[in-house]
Amino acid sequence: MKEFDYIIIGGGCAGLSLAYELEINNKLKEKTLAIIETRDEYKRDKTWSFWKVSDHNFEDCVIKSWNNFTINSSEGFHELINKSFPYQSINSEKFYKKINSKLNLNPSVSYFKSLNEINSENSLIFNSVFEGKLNKSKLWQHFQGIEIETPNDIFDDEIVNLMDFNCDQKNDVHFFYTLPFSKNTALIE
């Protein structure tokens, strides 16, 4: 079994972002890194969206950026402009390709499917993996979405519909979220 200076459990957005930052900031010089990830291949499986509050290293992975957004309710339609903090979406496939192509150039970075493949005996391990008991609160957030393409141009691709509450609330809070990537393609959740 091999030993490593750094071990990142999970090769998703957070884990790969950490590995990438270590690599580009020369923190892996003369160090070894193991990334534990169960997936067999990286493919486009997610779209990550966020408010851009500062510069980041993934501008080349951004598939769309918006300065305008709307919130709809039974009381009306509100359009807001936010040029200081645009809303951006990142294509996970571009993100994975960028990071993995950079990390694959470093022979000190290795990928594993299981933590059992790594020797952690006689080691000091800083455990940043959350292991606490979950608080069983009644608050639950769940998103389900699909990317659609329409035969006609029906979306205003300059405006994100951030929250559309014009749907049955069924004693809970429900809303639609529409990210128009073009005039005829959008992610709807």
Feature map (PLM): residue ranges:
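Beta1/beta-strand and adjacent pyrophosphate-binding region of the FAD-binding site
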Residues: 1-14, 34-36
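Short beta-strand to alpha-helix junction loop
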Residues: 79-101, 128-130
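Residue-level detector of conserved, well-ordered beta-strand and adjacent loop positions
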Residues: 72, 81, 179
